[in-house]
Amino acid sequence: MNANTVLPPGLLLVLSAPSGAGKTTLAHRLLKETPDAVFSISVTTRRPRGKEREGVDYNFVDVATFQSKIERGEFVEWAEVYGHFYGSPQSVVDEARARKSAAIFDIDVQGGQAIKRKHPDAVTIFVLPPSMEELERRLRDRQTDSDETIRRRMLAARSEIERGIASYDYVVVNDDFERAFSDLRSVVVAERCRRERVDVSKLGLGIGG
């Protein structure tokens, strides 16, 4: 970027991680401490699990409704995963741009990469567990998955970690939650202060957007 480049308004924050790394807890803490932020609630065609709530954890729709949303361009990214469709609403991006606020996406690497391709100014942050052993321990401590499910999650985690480390802008290790959140918040502060995000046109110096 040259000195006169100005990025679009709003800060698109993408958080990804393998299951059990703690990204959702970090994302909700960030939302709580960022009053003007918009949180992206994914749309999915799968059925609710456990205590999941409509409009809180996901927006649950049938396949026909999802396909209609695709045709109307209502998703900033969407994908089919294990026979179910998942998508992130374009309206979240539009709202963050209009309000010059932050949009927070809690999605997988595939979705994060899709957003980055469409919006190169998006900030991608990958949350790592301190070790694979600790990740497996966390999954077992949930006491919600069978041994076979945990085995599949661990295999998927290795692939997700490799892709995240290779392509994401930042990596945050979630060993201690408060330290991890401090690191995450530091990324947000630094990105807000990037030269390309600061409008200096009002200074009347003939620079900036």
Curated annotation (Swiss-Prot):
Gene Ontology molecular function = ATP binding; guanylate kinase activity
- What InterPro entries has UniProt attached to this entry? GK/Ca_channel_bsu, Guanylate_kin-like_dom, Guanylate_kinase, Guanylate_kinase_CS, P-loop_NTPase
Q: Which top EC class is named for this enzyme in its record?
A: transferase
Reaction equation(s) it catalyzes: GMP + ATP = GDP + ADP
Recorded E.C. number(s)?
A: 2.7.4.8
Which Gene Ontology cellular component terms are annotated?
cytosol
Q: Where is the Guanylate kinase-like domain?
A: 10-189
Where along this sequence does the record place binding of ATP?
17-24
Q: Where's it found, cell-wise?
A: Cytoplasm
Q: Does RNA-binding appear among the keywords? A: no
Checking PROSITE patterns in the record gives: GUANYLATE_KINASE_1, GUANYLATE_KINASE_2
Q: Name one Pfam family in it.
A: Guanylate_kin
Which terms are listed as keywords in the entry? ATP-binding, Cytoplasm, Kinase, Nucleotide-binding, Transferase
Family listed: Belongs to the guanylate kinase family.
Q: Known HAMAP family for this protein?
A: Guanylate_kinase (MF_00328)
The record ties this protein, via NCBIfam families, to:
guanyl_kin (TIGR03263)
**What is the role of the protein in this entry?**
Essential for recycling GMP and indirectly, cGMP.
Can you say what this protein is called? Answer: Guanylate kinase
UniProt lists the gene as gmk
